[in-house]
Amino acid sequence: QPLLAGSSLTSLDIEVAEGHYTEENMKSTVVPNRNMILLSVATGHALSIKAGQIAYAAHSGDHAIYPDCRNEFAEAMANAIMLADWEQIELIRPFVDWTKADIVRRGAELGVPFAKTWSCYKGGDLHCGRCGTCIERREAFDLAKVIDPTPYADDAPSVASLRAKEWRL
């Protein structure tokens, strides 16, 4: 059995759900213990290069689907990281209470090259425009009133059609 099986993000035989995040259709994207594993690896790397901080980009929209995106998890991990070694590593988590639209607005203010960022769970050459992360990305840009420079697949639904039935942020 593959390591971390049972998720559409780690198992090729499980299809990535399309549509907006709902508890049922997005359960397939939960990777067991993903953020604890990644934060542990990041902590080890930070210690090896003598960095004083690691950053964790969970945001408020993730909390309902992913238990390891809740503020309580981040607090517990911050404490564990401080206890993990004699060197102190701070876990910074600036977006834990922000929406994706808040993050897009701030990114636009800072000149983030959004065209070079990736959200799609399907992993093609272009963003699919149909999975939960693509829909939330489009919604965030729309709500933030920032032009989305992301190239989406030709068959992706229009922003107008998504706005009419799917927006939830």
Predicted regions and their residues:
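Glycine-rich loops and low-complexity Gly/Arg-rich segments
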Residues: 19-24, 78-82, 116-119, 143-146, ...
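Local cysteine-cluster metal-coordination motifs and their immediate loop/turn environment
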Residues: 40, 118-139
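Short Fe-S-cluster ligation motifs
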Residues: 135-137, 141-169
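ATP-dependent adenylation/nucleotidyltransferase module used to activate substrates
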Residues: 1-111
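Short C-terminal domain-edge/linker segments immediately following a structured domain
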Residues: 27-28, 84-89, 125, 149-151, ...
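Short, charged low-complexity linear segments at domain edges
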Residues: 95-121, 159-167
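Charge-dense, low-complexity polyampholytic segments
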Residues: 54, 121-127, 146-154
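Structured loop/turn residues at beta-strand edges in well-structured enzyme cores
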Residues: 49, 115, 129
